[in-house]
Amino acid sequence: FCTFSRLLSPPFRVNMVTTKGVRVSGGHLCEAEAPTEATAETKPENRYFTEENIMNAKTERQIENLKKQTIGVEIEMNHITRERAAKLAADHFGTGRYEYTASRNGYSTWSAWDAQGREWKFQKDVSIAGCDAEKCELVTPILKYEDIETLQELVRKLRKAGAISHAGIGAGVHIHIGANGHTPQTLRNLANLMASHERLIADALKIDQGRMNRYCRTVNPQFIEQLNRKKPTNMAQFADIWYTANGANYGRNQHYNDSRYHMLNFHATFTKGTIEFRLFQFDKPTAEKKNGLHAGQLKSYIQLCLALSEMAKGLRTASPKPQQTENPKFAMRTWLIRLGLVGEEFSTARNFLTKNLDGDAAFRFGR
């Protein structure tokens, strides 16, 4: 039976005891197999566990591996010029190096360089509301997990400088995870994971319906059906299914191929070698939290994408069947455990990804 260092509240309700661990409705707390008969001490109503103290060798490997993946982030904002944002970044990096690079990058780009010589771009994105001079999209270089803190610090400085980002101005957040290590099967797993959870994620993030209708649509049912029926064994076959099912078989190498406008964008996989998650946005500003930009929220989004990518690599298969809907908060919390987002390091992510959902996080069917 699994052992835990301590029990914390709020509790998690166990609904199956096994020889190797416990299983929770909607997700596994520990690696589980061979169900055993529950005793008086191990009956579901008598055993409660929490995500903070759930850690085994499998989860530790999961967390270790998710941190090895590469990251790219795009943050759309306004109320700050691209030149000013680039100067702020250059000062933040301590290099003082920033310049106008539109002749090379297009999009009226201003670039800043960090101490490692990496180029951080601030580009014009016409989909953002506001005057043209202040339509600004931050495009990071390829980052590693340990660079997240640097990105967070930059986001805080941009916010303090007046930059604003939220769905009300047409601004979103796109996160790229390096596709290295993925196969047609693991990408199929990822597509099914998104198909089965994207409604839950959309509710958790309160994704703007206008963005969902245009720029971050849900997974195309025809794509999922063809993907699971044909079971591609190479990337060329996978690409054929992606583009044809999405009605975008033209211009596969074009940046603005229409297939890209999905929460999960595999067009980036075939053109950039990344998996793009386009669904994120910052909360609408309030009196307490101005300008929308939030470093903790951004880190939570990155961690979720890393965990999704890593889980897809570790599964033999995944189902596109939607999750239970009678208790969304419980469904999300147990899923985050399966993703490996346990312990203090991921507590902020768990909070951001469950706080907007209805239901009881500890009891699937109520107390």
Predicted segments with their positions:
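Residue-identity detector for glycine
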Residues: G21, G26-G27
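Short, conserved phosphate-binding/catalytic loop or strand-edge motifs used
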Residues: I169-I177
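Leucine-biased recognition of intrinsically disordered, low-complexity hydrophobic segments
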Residues: L7-L8, L29
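C-terminal accessory/tail domains of diverse enzymes
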Residues: E51-A167, N180-R367
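Short, Lys/Arg-enriched N-terminal segments with co-localized hydrophobic residues
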Residues: P35-I54
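Short, positively charged and aromatic/hydrophobic N-terminal segments
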Residues: T3, L7, V14-T18, E45-E51
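Cysteine-centered metal-binding/redox modules
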Residues: M16, V24, E33
